């Protein structure tokens, strides 16, 4: 469980005690992370990722397009005179990135070169490793927020983080009124939808309504509605069981406690 996640136990094991303590302080209290601390964290994160087979890293964020966005950069720097290369990853590269915001829809309101967007490392979410599109390589994913030059949220995560901070502030205020003087933080829990429909790819590609809208817009009702046992409590077919086995294993590797 969590073998592909740079989680708290990995950080505690690999980071110097002072660095680990400062990073935890940043995570828990929202304090600014010093550059020297970020450099050490970046180095250990890179070494851990390389040991896991990663060659690239990505600032991973959720823009307002409804999908995730990522830009892959290699750990390998320019070759030296002897032809050898260095595997580098600095604290500056960890903490902040500058993807081109002109890659996203703007309605033509701004010139391309003025569409500035910045990714900022969200250290409250652990970095993780996933296989690349070929299935043979691996990429270090660094969860980030995506903001404009003046601080406007350009993604789904920034409003979530700000909402969590607002809830924390007011919940702590209420706890103090009730006499609780020990709690330091209130953290809400959010999760993905627990119910979904699994459709065979061959059948899915024949249904334009599913492709374009994600739901059924036409088709006949079942002969008996839902009176039979072929829906929620039907027998699980072998292909579906194997699919769920793969899903569970991949989620567990990423530290997701799928039920």
Give each language-model segment a name.
Residues 2-90, 95-114:
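Histidine/acidic residue-rich metal-binding segments in metalloenzymes
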Residues 116-259:
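Glycine-rich, acidic/polar active-site loops that bind/position phosphate-bearing ligands
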